[in-house]
């Protein structure tokens, strides 16, 4: 059956057994899990509502469409992640009279997504969703990824202040390379590294992994 529901179905709020807020939350959580595990194209509206245990019309009623639901999850989760980063950066600035060192700036950038990705963290599914959305998302998501850099501007400014001898161009390039570290260091990929190293690199400790990443990134930034 197509994901396009009829106008009449769209107009009906399927409230049996659920109040509207609970239904919307159930749809959101189910969609996030399924998109994270299967990918966007492999999940239908019927899959989402079955997982959530709600009426088929719920997705369109509360979010408008599957695409709009995907964007809402992406917007909310990236917003939460970037607010956590901003909070850590602000705290680092407070500790250092407005001029935190490179390592603490990078820690504010790295630590939130790394901690979310910990297999023991309930937030892990949100990171998995964000990763999927970055590679499989809609044109609207791709547009945000390309053009919404406001959350990175504060890091660039802090790094320029911490490295006054570096040309601004170099600061931006080095920040770009540091973002690559974040995007490519996920627990799911460590089995490959462990195989490559003959068992020397097994890492399940977020704190230890964060320290390794910061050692590398700080040295690169200050080189």
Regions found by a protein language model. Name each.
Residues 86-123, 175:
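Hydrophobic alpha-helical connector segments
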Residues 20, 24, 28-32:
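Short, leucine-enriched amphipathic alpha-helices that occur as contiguous helical runs
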Residues 68, 77-92:
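Conserved phosphoryl-transfer catalytic core
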């Amino acid at each position: 059956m197509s994901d396009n529901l009829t106008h009449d179905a769209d107009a009906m709020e399927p409230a049996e057994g659920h109040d509207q807020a609970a239904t919307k939350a159930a749809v959101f959580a189910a969609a996030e899990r399924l998109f994270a595990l299967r990918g966007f194209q492999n999940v239908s509206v019927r899959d989402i509502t079955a997982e959530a245990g709600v009426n088929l019309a719920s997705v369109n009623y509360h979010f408008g469409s599957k695409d709009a639901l995907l964007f809402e999850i992406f917007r909310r989760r990236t917003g939460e992640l970037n607010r956590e980063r901003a909070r850590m950066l602000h705290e680092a600035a407070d500790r250092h009279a407005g001029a935190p060192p490179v390592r603490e700036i990078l820690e504010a950038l790295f630590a939130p997504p790394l901690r979310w990705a910990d297999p023991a963290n309930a937030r892990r599914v949100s990171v998995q969703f964000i990763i999927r959305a970055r590679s499989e998302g809609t044109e609207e998501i791709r547009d945000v990824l390309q053009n919404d850099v406001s959350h990175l501007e504060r890091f660039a400014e802090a790094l320029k202040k911490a490295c006054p001898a570096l040309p601004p161009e170099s600061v931006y390039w080095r920040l770009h390379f540091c973002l690559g570290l974040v995007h490519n260091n996920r627990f799911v990929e460590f089995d490959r590294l462990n195989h490559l190293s003959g068992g020397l690199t097994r890492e399940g400790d977020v704190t230890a992994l964060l320290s390794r990443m910061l050692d590398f990134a700080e040295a690169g930034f200050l080189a």
